[in-house]
């Protein structure tokens, strides 16, 4: 008997193993009505009928299970039909995102669509969009594909239409949203309960020191013989097995409780995304949670094109964790690495120092050195990592050593330059080493009295074939040298021809090296002739030139150079250049060979020296400080294209430092290539140890034929070892590591390729991974086992043992000393408190002062308060208000010492006359500013209203021992004065800007990776690009400075006790030096003042100057001012006129679209509610999805939601919780750590409502109330001027805050301006950043115009350079507001018009330097009404 459709469905459900996961009615009433099979296309289409819609998660599970089951047979498609579609309105919204993903729309369009709201009307799905442009765009893009996707899921949808959203949604939408909102809240509650349960289970597991699943294993075991490299996966396949290491994990929970798991793995041939849906009632999730980044897995599944990311991914059916033996150092005796580069080696090293230290510790190495290029910025992290892993850290640096002065004249003789005879010569050779290469051409000309009087030109036979490089460079071929004489004959003849003439050569050290080597081999000894180097001479007398190559100089001197790199042509060109240089020297007062070095060498001579690499290793604590001094001098005093270390500087500070020879760019390695052994051994005596590195690291020199072969390289090693023996210093093998593992090399290649000017771009990068002991021993096996062991193991360990334990960062805070600081802070606090509250202070004031002063004085923080007080006082004395940031307003002592205007006491009244006071400490009032006006019951005067109810604990912690972080907002234009005042307070050498380190960001790294792959013609899938991006991210790119951070060094120490110093981004013209270490590294060791710049104090100052009103006298509770936060009526305009429901355009903190929407939702009427808004808008997950929903649902109002972090502590204490528990809860919540069981229990015991607990759990970050109160206070003052003194306000706003102006629109009538704003709103999604900035200005201008004021065009006679000025009921814009016109030109126009009126546009261009584009703009603006193009010549001018 044939099976029914329902029986077929049950069989199918059993076969795909989801019977126990489907709802009972689905299992019983579901029908498999048909299967359409296409053998040609290998597709099976299942026709399935269901009684009602599946939940979206069950739908995904069901379809995925079918696809997995039949994937090896065919590609599966499923068409659903649904019998009961009455609730399809509800399910359409849930399926919407999935159906979008099934279309072929671009990812961008898909993302935009998913944000839209829906309305079901019969069988028509309406998608609400913002404007007509969006409507047309989506309508065209979807083209029926969305309907098809919905119908395939079983929806009876005939049409999808896109409609422009109106401000008033209809009842259907409201009802639907309410339903969805209710469901979301239920899901949120369930998720919270699950989270608490999971936390409890996790805690229980931790207590028992066990895990639910120790090793991931899902599905069938995977046969290792089926594994294929990821790079071989290039198309969709039914079944593939791979293995790789995880570098990213994403677990996303679905509403059903199941998860979708996404792993990114790599086998270092390529990378791949692996996906899987966890199964219901299975422990898949526990298995996946056992995985972590860095673990290896073996996975099997179907390779398919992911329509969303448009890339191949694996839909896993099976996965298992596997063990991969990590790289090990199996040597019994381990080496010590003395040459290693971290991510602090700018755009060169890859891992941070912590990764190296962890690896070295795992390998059993006893010590490790860090030697970044030119910097020591890894030291703090190195110290922390070494302490953590129990390894000895050796601190060092690879620097750039230069001689203090490079001679221009060698072996100077008493010869008059005018009368002397010169031999200008050049050699062409088989290579660059005078020790291993040979001369193939020697050419010279003899010069006397400014004329060439003789020539010498000879080839010599090297008896070896020339390399292609030399042939291409010199155009000399083997045939040309076959019959040439021996070099001995050529040099003998040349020596006789030269006589006692002075040698002249371009880069003479190279040419003379070959001459002297040749002479010595002939037994002549080195040349005794005087020498002049035209390269160094040009660098000295032509300092304005950026280049000094022969080609460049020939052009500059007008000398013909027909064939560069042929000796005779180079020689003749050099001779004619030198003849002109002799004349230049005469003009500089140099007439004798003896005078050249004396008169031409100056203090900048170090700039001419060629830097050699040198390794500096800190031996003890004194050496650390000396290294800090060396680093600082190289970055500040001797910086020229790169930090340089003059030899004299190194000698001065070498105590406690071991000096090594570094790499192939070191002085000693170069000497081995260029000088004889006696000279090499002489140079070696300057050093404390000699470095040799694996042959692979010199491969680039061999590729460039600087080292001709392995035999030559072996000779170089032996000469270096002999030099060490002669100088009695150890020779050690170093790895010059730039990354951890071989497969990390690609990241370094990408970084180097991103720097076009980097010389490493011209060569093959060597293998520079962190080598094990056995790897190093293998690298040096050619020296013999005994010698290899000596330099790799014995010598490195002996050297490490000579180095003491060094600590690069301090373990406590060192604050400046100010005599009498404790007494002054106490006296100042009480003095000002008595001025405000009277001689008989209220007990609440005394208690608060004593509590704070005990903490401040007891922990040594008085000086910090006193410094801040003096900085603020100086600013106030100079006429600029200061706004406080952060939590300093939580301190009543800060209020009484006038560091902050925020008063943290509970709300209260004070009488300025008789000092009567009344406090409200029961939580009934949010802010003192909200108290009703009241007369003093004692004397009848109007009472002052104060107090924001902020606990002190939010500033210095519950015990009051947290180092105070006082952030102050100075006027942006006054900030430099405040910074410089710290030099007056402490001394120039005691204050520095807080340094920062800028690293490669993810987006930047993505650009580097894409650029590299494109240049190399390589295509990689997205997962591999992500891996490469991760490898490049975090590498140091530059340095900078904190915008307002000033580091203060105490008078009993100097900066080098803490950190080296430098200029930000190595900008030698910067006004301030910065700390070399990132300021976070020394944050707990030295005082950091946050002297920040802000627009609000600047704007307040301008408003004060315009109006004469003292901002401190402005009433904070002015009703008309407060009204603009809920509507624009007090501005005299309507919502329709200004296209906004509030009047807060341009009001700090309340002018953005996001906050204006909050104001519309909440309609605040009090200061405390504005503080709530400020806190809510700056927090993370405090407003959206949290307080916003609570207010909308009517659960609580604006005043009772959690807005600022301090609210939690205050509320919970009023509720009855112990202060310590209230504080602890606040700290947990504000850091996004949720609530512990102990906190929940305490809150419930004190009847804290459930919504409050739920709200706490959602919060990720919270704003301090003191910060919010300070911001709001400034905002209300500025808003007061906007309401009552509008032209002053608009003039100040446009001058201080606005930056992008559309003056042509702004001078139009109010209707035109409003239409432009409205049009820009309709196109908002398509606007760029600049257009959005213009829109912000036009919103203000539209409001100003509708208030009856207008903007004039630019006036050549009246406009100022930078400030908007008032004329009647209009504003006149400044020149700086003209697009494309800079500050200098704006100032120049003002200066030029003072000399007389502009006669024409040509005159304007000539006097003020205006471009034609700017003149045309001014013309269009109507600013040049009577100005002719050119001045007319009058008879009276003749």
Swiss-Prot record:
It holds the Pfam family RNase_T. GO terms for molecular function: 3'-5' exonuclease activity; DNA binding; DNA-directed DNA polymerase activity. The keyword Transport does not apply. Keywords: Cytoplasm, DNA replication, DNA-directed DNA polymerase, Exonuclease, Hydrolase, Nuclease, Nucleotidyltransferase, Transferase. Gene3D superfamilies: 1.10.150.870, 3.30.1900.20, 6.10.140.1510, Metal-dependent hydrolases, Nucleic acid-binding proteins, PolC, middle finger domain, Ribonuclease H-like superfamily/Ribonuclease H. It catalyses: DNA(n) + a 2'-deoxyribonucleoside 5'-triphosphate = DNA(n+1) + diphosphate. It is found in: Cytoplasm. It comes from the Bacteria. It is an enzyme of class 2 (transferase). InterPro entries: DNA_pol3_alpha_NTPase_dom, DNA_pol3_finger, DNA_PolC-like_N_II, DNA_PolC-type_N_I, DnaE2/DnaE/PolC, DNAPol_HHH, DnaQ, Exonuclease_RNaseT/DNA_pol3. Disulfide bonds: none annotated. Its EC number is 2.7.7.7. One of its GO terms (cellular component) is cytoplasm. GO terms for biological process: DNA-templated DNA replication. Residues 422-578 form the Exonuclease domain. Belongs to the DNA polymerase type-C family. PolC subfamily. Required for replicative DNA synthesis. This DNA polymerase also exhibits 3' to 5' exonuclease activity. This is DNA polymerase III PolC-type. It comes from Staphylococcus epidermidis (strain ATCC 35984 / DSM 28319 / BCRC 17069 / CCUG 31568 / BM 3577 / RP62A). The lineage of its organism: Bacteria, Bacillati, Bacillota, Bacilli, Bacillales.
């Amino acid at each position: 008997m044939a099976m029914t459709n329902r029986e077929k469905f049950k069989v199918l459900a059993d076969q795909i193993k989801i019977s126990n996961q489907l709802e009972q009615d689905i299992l019983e009433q579901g029908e498999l009505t048909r299967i359409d099979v296409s053998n040609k296309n290998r597709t099976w289409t299942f026709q399935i009928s269901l009684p009602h819609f599946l939940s979206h998660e069950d739908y995904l599970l069901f379809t995925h299970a079918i696809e997995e089951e039949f994937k090896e047979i065919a590609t599966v498609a499923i068409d659903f039909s649904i019998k009961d579609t009455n609730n399809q309105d509800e399910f359409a919204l849930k399926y919407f995102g999935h159906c979008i993903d099934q279309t072929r729309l671009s990812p961008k369009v898909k993302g935009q669509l998913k944000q839209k709201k829906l309305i079901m009307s019969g069988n028509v799905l309406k998608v609400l969009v913002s404007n007509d442009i969006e409507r047309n765009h989506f309508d065209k893009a979807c083209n029926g594909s969305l309907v098809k996707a919905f119908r395939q899921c079983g929806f009876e949808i005939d049409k999808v239409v896109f409609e422009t959203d109106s401000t008033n949604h209809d009842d259907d939408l409201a009802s639907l949203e309410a339903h969805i909102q209710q469901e979301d809240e239920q899901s949120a509650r369930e998720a919270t309960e699950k989270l608490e349960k999971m936390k409890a289970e996790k805690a229980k597991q931790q207590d028992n020191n066990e895990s639910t699943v120790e090793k991931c294993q899902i599905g069938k075991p995977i046969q290792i013989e089926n594994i294929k490299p990821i790079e071989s996966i290039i198309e969709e396949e039914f079944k593939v097995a791979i293995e790789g290491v995880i570098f990213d994990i994403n677990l996303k929970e679905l509403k059903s409780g199941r998860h979708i798991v996404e792993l990114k793995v790599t086998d270092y041939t390529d990378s791949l995304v692996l996906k899987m849906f966890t199964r219901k009632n299975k422990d898949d999730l526990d298995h996946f949670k056992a995985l972590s980044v860095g673990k290896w897995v073996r996975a099997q599944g179907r390779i398919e094109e992911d329509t969303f990311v448009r890339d191949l991914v694996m839909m896993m059916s099976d996965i298992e964790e596997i063990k991969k033996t990590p790289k090990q150092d199996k040597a019994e005796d381990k080496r010590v690495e003395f040459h290693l580069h971290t991510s602090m080696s700018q755009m060169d090293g890859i891992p941070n120092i912590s990764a190296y230290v962890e690896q070295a510790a795992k390998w059993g190495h006893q010590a490790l050195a860090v030697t970044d290029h030119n910097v020591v910025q890894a030291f703090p992290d190195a110290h922390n990592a070494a302490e953590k892993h129990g390894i000895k850290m050796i601190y060092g640096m690879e620097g750039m050593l230069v001689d203090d002065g490079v001679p221009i004249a060698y072996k100077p003789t008493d010869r008059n330059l005018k009368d002397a005879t010169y031999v200008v010569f050049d050699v062409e050779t088989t290579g660059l080493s005078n020790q291993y290469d040979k001369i193939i051409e020697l050419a010279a000309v003899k010069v006397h009295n400014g004329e060439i009087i003789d020539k010498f030109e000879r080839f010599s036979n090297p008896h070896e074939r020339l390399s292609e490089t030399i042939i291409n460079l010199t155009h000399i071929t083997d045939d040309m040298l076959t019959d040439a004489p021996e070099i001995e004959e050529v040099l003998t003849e040349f020596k006789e021809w030269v006589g006692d003439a002075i040698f002249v050569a371009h880069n003479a050290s190279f040419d003379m090296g070959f001459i002297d080597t040749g002479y010595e081999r002939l037994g002549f000894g080195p040349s005794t002739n005087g020498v002049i180097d035209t390269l160094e001479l040009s660098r000295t007398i032509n300092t304005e030139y950026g280049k000094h190559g022969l080609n460049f100089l020939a052009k500059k001197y007008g000398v013909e150079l027909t064939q560069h790199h042929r000796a005779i042509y180079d020689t003749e060109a050099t001779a004619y250049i030198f003849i002109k240089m002799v004349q230049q020297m005469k003009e500089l007062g140099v007439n004798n060979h003896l005078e050249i070095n004396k008169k031409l060498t100056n203090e900048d001579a170090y700039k001419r020296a060629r830097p050699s690499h040198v390794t500096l290793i800190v031996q003890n604590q004194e050496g650390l400080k000396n290294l800090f001094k060396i680093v600082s001098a190289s970055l500040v005093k001797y910086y020229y294209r790169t930090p340089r270390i003059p030899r004299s500087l190194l000698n001065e500070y070498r105590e406690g430092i071991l000096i090594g020879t570094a790499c192939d760019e070191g002085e000693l390695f170069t000497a081995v290539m260029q000088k004889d052994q006696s000279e090499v051994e002489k140079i070696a005596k300057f050093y404390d140890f000699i470095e040799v590195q694996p042959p692979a690291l010199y491969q680039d020199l061999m590729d460039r034929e600087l080292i001709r072969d392995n035999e030559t390289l072996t000779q170089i090693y032996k000469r270096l070892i002999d030099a060490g023996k002669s100088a009695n210093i150890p020779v050690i093998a170093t790895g010059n590591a730039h990354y951890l593992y071989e497969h990390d090399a690609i990241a370094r290649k990408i970084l180097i390729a991103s720097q076009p000017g980097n010389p490493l771009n011209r060569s093959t990068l060597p293998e520079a991974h962190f080598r094990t002991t056995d790897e190093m021993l293998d690298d040096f096996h050619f020296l013999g086992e005994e010698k290899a062991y000596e330099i790799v193991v014995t010598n490195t360990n002996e050297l490490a043992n000579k180095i003491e334990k060094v600590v690069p960062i301090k373990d406590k805070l060192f604050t400046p000393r100010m005599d009498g600081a404790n007494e002054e802070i106490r006296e100042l606090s009480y003095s000002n408190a008595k001025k405000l509250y009277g001689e008989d202070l209220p007990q609440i004031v005394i208690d608060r002062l004593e509590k704070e002063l005990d903490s401040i004085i007891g922990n040594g923080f008085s000086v910090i308060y006193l410094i801040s007080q003096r900085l603020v006082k100086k600013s106030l004395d100079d006429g600029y208000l200061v706004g406080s940031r952060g939590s300093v307003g939580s301190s009543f002592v800060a209020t009484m010492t006038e560091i902050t205007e925020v008063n943290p006491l509970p709300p209260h009244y004070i009488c300025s006359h008789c000092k009567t006071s009344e406090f409200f400490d029961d939580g009934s009032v949010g802010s003192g500013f909200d108290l009703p006006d009241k007369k003093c019951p004692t004397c009848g005067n109007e009472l002052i209203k104060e107090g924001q109810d902020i606990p002190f604990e939010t500033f210095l912690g519950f015990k009051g021992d947290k180092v105070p972080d006082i952030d102050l907002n100075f006027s942006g234009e006054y900030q430099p004065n405040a910074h410089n005042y710290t030099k007056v307070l402490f001394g120039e050498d005691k204050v520095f800007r807080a340094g920062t380190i800028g690293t490669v960001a993810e987006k930047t790294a993505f650009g580097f990776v894409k650029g590299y792959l494109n240049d190399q013609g390589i295509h990689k899938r997205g997962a591999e690009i992500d891996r490469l991006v991760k490898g490049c991210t975090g590498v140091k790119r530059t340095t900078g400075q904190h915008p307002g951070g000033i580091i203060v060094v105490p008078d009993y120490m100097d900066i080098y006790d803490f950190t080296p110093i430098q200029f930000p981004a190595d900008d030698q013209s910067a006004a301030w030096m910065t700390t070399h270490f990132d300021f976070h590294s020394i944050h707990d060791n030295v005082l950091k003042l946050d002297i920040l710049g802000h627009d609000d104090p600047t704007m307040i100052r301008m408003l004060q100057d315009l109006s004469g009103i003292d901002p401190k006298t402005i009433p904070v509770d002015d009703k008309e001012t407060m009204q603009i936060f809920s509507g624009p009526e007090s501005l005299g305009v309507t919502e329709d006129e200004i296209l906004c429901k509030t009047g807060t355009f341009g009001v700090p903190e309340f002018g953005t679209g996001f906050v204006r929407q909050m104001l519309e939702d909440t309609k605040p009427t009090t200061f405390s509610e504005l503080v709530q808004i400020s806190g809510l808008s700056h927090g993370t997950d405090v407003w959206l999805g949290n307080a916003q929903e609570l207010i909308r649902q009517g659960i609580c109002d604006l005043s009772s939601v959690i807005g600022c972090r301090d609210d939690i502590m205050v509320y919970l204490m009023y509720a009855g919780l112990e202060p310590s528990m209230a504080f602890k809860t606040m700290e947990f919540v504000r850091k996004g750590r949720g609530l512990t069981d102990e906190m929940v229990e305490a809150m419930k015991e004190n009847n804290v409502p459930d919504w409050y607990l739920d709200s706490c759990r959602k919060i990720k970050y919270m704003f301090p109330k003191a910060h919010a109160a300070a911001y709001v206070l400034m905002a209300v003052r500025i808003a007061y001027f906007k309401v009552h003194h509008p032209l002053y306000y608009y003039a100040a706003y446009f001058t201080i805050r606005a930056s992008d102006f559309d003056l042509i629109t702004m001078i139009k009538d109010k209707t035109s301006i409003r239409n432009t704003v409205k049009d820009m709103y309709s196109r908002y999604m398509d606007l760029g950043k600049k257009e959005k900035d213009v829109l912000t200005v036009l919103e203000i201008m539209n409001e100003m115009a509708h208030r009856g004021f207008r903007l004039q065009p630019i006036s050549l006679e009246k406009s100022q350079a930078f400030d908007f000025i008032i004329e009647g009921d209009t504003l006149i814009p400044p020149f700086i507001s003209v697009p494309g016109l800079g500050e200098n030109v704006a100032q120049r126009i003002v200066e030029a018009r003072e000399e007389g009126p502009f006669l024409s546009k040509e005159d304007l261009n000539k006097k003020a330097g205006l471009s034609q584009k700017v003149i045309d703009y001014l013309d269009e603006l109507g600013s040049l009404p009577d100005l002719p193009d050119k001045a007319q010549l009058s008879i009276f001018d003749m």
